[in-house]
Amino acid sequence: MLFEQGQQALELPECTMQKAAYYENPGLFGGYGYSKTTDTYGYSTPHQPYPPPAAASSLDTDYPGSACSIQSSAPLRAPAHKGAELNGSCMRPGTGNSQGGGGGSQPPGLNSEQQPPQPPPPPPTLPPSSPTNPGGGVPAKKPKGGPNASSSSATISKQIFPWMKESRQNSKQKNSCATAGESCEDKSPPGPASKRVRTAYTSAQLVELEKEFHFNRYLCRPRRVEMANLLNLTERQIKIWFQNRRMKYKKDQKAKGILHSPASQSPERSPPLGGAAGHVAYSGQLPPVPGLAYDAPSPPAFAKSQPNMYGLAAYTAPLSSCLPQQKRYAAPEFEPHPMASNGGGFASANLQGSPVYVGGNFVESMAPASGPVFNLGHLSHPSSASVDYSCAAQIPGNHHHGPCDPHPTYTDLSAHHSSQGRLPEAPKLTHL
């Protein structure tokens, strides 16, 4: 009786720790021989009807339980002398407290099932192999949830790498793609230093953006918000698109200026470009390089130079006094060095302001002789046409001073006309 009570006392904590998760499956453990005559487990060689290896592996994978899981469906029967040894072997690899039987005893159970020929009495050989279990430190939480405990330990052991996380850029790109319905390009794996994804605009969006750019180069914020709502884009995308488009426009204008250099210009096309570029140069928007004077034939430049042109009637006398100088200097005996050095501040402005250098009117007209200086009545640039004609009415034949009009305040006009006389070398020196 005392022996049975002792066995029951040993059995009760184990029964409280390990509930029906391991005991309610008699079919799985039916292969183990249990002799009711001696109340002991069949570990001797004639009593080893172990399941086949597939069944054993299924037991290992499904129920990575303790060594006590070998018990059959009648756990309340007090086993004899080997029951204490098994319980001891369950408790020994654990932490030493009452929960060690359920928690830290999983590795010995696996080893005892994987190595059936070993008898259980030498348990000290089993604990060294316990660290081979990958979840050895985790499963001491709940002894009764065998499969649940293993799955929870598997989920806990999952590591979240940085490239798995969703960054702010990726979430914004997903949202914009979903709202705009665009065909987004495949995103590269979003690493910490990944590049910003290029936005793919649809043709309808591009048409609307181009139309808006045609009317307004710079968008105010209310209009930008309106277009963002209209095109299903963000304000930032529209702002960046306009920035890029302005840069492209500037490059196109620069390329046009290089193409329309005086060496490749025709007379009918040069005067408008020359007049426009002359007024822009006088308003101080361009550096003193004559080749760049074509870059900005824009209406605001004309508006800036209008006040200077309206006051030209007062300068008819200096212009008339310039006429003999022009006739005198029109001969080709002048050396070209002031043109290369641009002769100081006002001379650079003269070089830019006059379509003689910029537009190239006189390159074709002055080649025969100095007389064709007076042929410029039909080549007047449009922006200063009204003032030029008033000057020409007062001083007949002086309309060639139209190039002087944008800068009438410079008193030393002789330098200007001498630079006009050196026109035949202008393309060679300024556009090499």
Swiss-Prot record:
Chief localization? nucleus
Localization of this protein: Nucleus
Motif annotated as Antp-type hexapeptide, chain positions: 160-165
Tell me, what is one Gene Ontology molecular-function annotation carried by this entry?
RNA polymerase II cis-regulatory region sequence-specific DNA binding
The Gene Ontology CC terms held by the record are: aggresome; chromatin; nuclear body; nucleoplasm; nucleus
Q: Which InterPro entries match?
A: DUF4074 (IPR025281), HD (IPR001356), HD_metazoa (IPR020479), Homeobox_Antennapedia_CS (IPR001827), Homeobox_CS (IPR017970), Homeodomain-like_sf (IPR009057)
Q: Keyword set for this entry?
A: Developmental protein, DNA-binding, Homeobox, Nucleus, Transcription, Transcription regulation
Q: What ranges are recorded for DNA binding?
A: 194-253
Region entry Disordered, spans:
43-62, 68-197, 253-280, 400-432
Comp. bias intervals (Gly residues): 97-106
- Which SMART domains has this protein been placed in? HOX
- Please give the Pfam families that the UniProt record associates with this protein: DUF4074, Homeodomain
- Please, one GO biological process term? cell-matrix adhesion
Q: Where is the composition biased (Polar residues)?
A: 148-158
> What does the similarity note say?
Belongs to the Antp homeobox family.
Q: What does this protein do?
A: Sequence-specific transcription factor which is part of a developmental regulatory system that provides cells with specific positional identities on the anterior-posterior axis.
Which protein, by its recorded name, is this? Homeobox protein Hox-D3
Organism, by scientific name, is Homo sapiens (Human)
Q: In the UniProt record, what gene is named as encoding this protein?
A: HOXD3
